[in-house]
């Protein structure tokens, strides 16, 4: 009798659980408590490390990575909160909004690193007319993506409140993520073009031939360094500077993992809010949480502040239409090094503000138009 009762209860448990979660914003899935608490701890540690690195290296653009850490912590707090109430809209929005936009800040920092690398290796390796153009173009693209996602989320929220279809809002939200993925795909092409130029093309130039052979690997970076920008040879050639030697590899790992994560998020929304991807947390764990963790840990170990000697070395981004190779060169490293920490920090701060000036003004104008649009529609209804 007891066995029969246990069997009956065992068969009913999945049905009871499904019924209890029928109002779940996660399509019936309950976020794993242990995993999400673990991620809060991990991101809390990474956030603390990046704050310390900012104070140690005074590399202004580290703030972008700190913003990512804060958003990831908040996002996983939202998922932990959702574990006890999967129908809580506040917890769900905290999770979705924070974890969705967090990679944008990491990519903003990465875009700026490519501009720095072009200054270190030479402008002739850049496909765009100015190193800062990479920051302008792709940060603007990310901001547009964020705005479109925000509009889509707003339309979904209004639809849920009014009890109408969320199809339009979903489509707008998907369009925002698609813009982000397309932007990253273009950046990846530019990034690999840059790597091809500094690792393959220079070796062809060095041997005055273009073989497609593994023999190119036998040519060391030291042998071809004369083909790079002379001014920063000390950054590239110092034997003990392993952080810089592997920095390009670290950047590649970070970009590819974040790109994988963004593709997953896009696929998740295309499948639907109650689709297979969003209702099976293992996909989120592997393709979102793990990818972002790998990217951030990589950028923590190979921090740009250490790679570029952020506390003592000035690498200003040259203005557009100015070729740094035509400027006076110096063999004296001391002319490049600046022992004034505050001065170097001010340089990084000015470059950060310059790179963000146009994107922020564009963002403000765009949001103003959106607000006016919703305001006019609200007045029309009244």
Curated annotation (Swiss-Prot):
Q: Per the UniProt entry, what are the Gene Ontology biological process annotations, in alphabetical order?
A: lipid transport
Transmembrane residue ranges: 35-55, 58-78, 91-111, 136-156, 172-192, 242-262, 282-302
Record function comment: Catalyzes the ATP-dependent translocation of sphingoid long-chain bases (LCBs) from the cytoplasmic site toward the extracytoplasmic side of the membrane (flip-flop). Involved in the establishment of the functional lipid asymmetry of the plasma membrane. Regulates intracellular levels of LCBs, sphingolipid precursors that are growth inhibitory at increased levels.
Sorted keywords for this record are: Cell membrane, Glycoprotein, Lipid transport, Membrane, Transmembrane, Transmembrane helix, Transport
Subcellular locations according to the entry: Cell membrane
Cytoplasmic side, ranges: 56-57, 112-135, 193-241, 303-382
| UniProt xrefs under PANTHER family | PROTEIN RTA1-RELATED, SPHINGOID LONG-CHAIN BASE TRANSPORTER RSB1
**Name of the protein in its database record:** Sphingoid long-chain base transporter RSB1
Induction conditions: In response to loss of mitochondrial DNA in a transcription factor PDR3-dependent manner. Induced in response to altered glycerophospholipid asymmetry of the plasma membrane in a transcription factor PDR1-dependent manner.
Stated family? Belongs to the lipid-translocating exporter (LTE) (TC 9.A.26.1) family.
Signal peptide: which range, if any? Answer: none
For this record, the Gene Ontology CC terms, alphabetical, are: fungal-type vacuole; plasma membrane
Membrane topology reported for the UniProt record: Multi-pass membrane protein
Extracellular side of membrane: 1-34, 79-90, 157-171, 263-281
């Amino acid at each position: 009798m007891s066995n029969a009762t246990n069997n009956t209860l065992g068969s009913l448990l999945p049905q009871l659980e499904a019924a209890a979660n029928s109002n779940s914003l996660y399509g019936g899935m309950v976020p794993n408590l242990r995993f999400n608490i673990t991620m809060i701890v991990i991101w809390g540690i990474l956030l603390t490390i990046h704050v310390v690195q900012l104070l140690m290296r005074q590399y202004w653009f580290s703030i972008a990575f700190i913003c990512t850490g804060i958003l990831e912590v908040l996002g996983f707090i939202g998922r932990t909160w959702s574990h006890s109430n999967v129908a809580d809209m506040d917890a769900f929005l905290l999770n979705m909004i924070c974890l969705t936009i967090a990679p944008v800040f990491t990519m903003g920092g990465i875009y700026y690193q490519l501009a720095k690398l072009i200054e270190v290796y030479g402008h002739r390796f850049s496909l765009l007319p100015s190193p800062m153009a990479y920051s302008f173009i792709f940060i603007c693209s990310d901001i547009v993506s964020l705005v479109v996602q925000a509009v889509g989320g707003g339309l979904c929220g209004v639809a849920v409140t009014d009890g109408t279809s969320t199809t339009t809002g979903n489509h707008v939200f998907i369009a925002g993520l698609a813009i982000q993925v397309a932007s990253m795909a273009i950046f990846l092409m530019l990034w690999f073009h840059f790597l091809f130029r500094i690792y393959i093309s220079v070796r062809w130039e060095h041997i005055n031939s273009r073989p497609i052979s593994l023999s190119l690997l036998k040519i060391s970076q030291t042998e071809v360094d004369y083909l790079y920008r002379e001014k920063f040879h000390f950054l590239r050639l110092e034997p003990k500077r392993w952080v810089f030697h592997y920095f390009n590899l670290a950047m590649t790992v970070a970009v590819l993992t974040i790109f994988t994560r963004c593709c997953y998020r896009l696929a998740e929304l295309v499948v639907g809010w109650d689709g297979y991807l969003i209702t099976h947390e293992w996909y989120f764990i592997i393709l979102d949480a793990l990818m972002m963790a790998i990217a951030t840990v990589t950028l923590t170990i190979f921090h740009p502040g250490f790679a570029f000697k952020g506390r003592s070395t000035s690498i200003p981004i040259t203005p557009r239409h100015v070729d740094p190779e035509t400027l006076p060169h110096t063999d004296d490293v001391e002319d490049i090094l600046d022992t004034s920490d505050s001065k170097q920090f001010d340089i990084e701060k000015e470059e950060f503000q310059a790179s963000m000036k146009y994107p922020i003004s564009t963002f403000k104008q765009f949001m103003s138009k959106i607000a006016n649009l919703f305001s006019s529609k609200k007045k029309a209804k009244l």
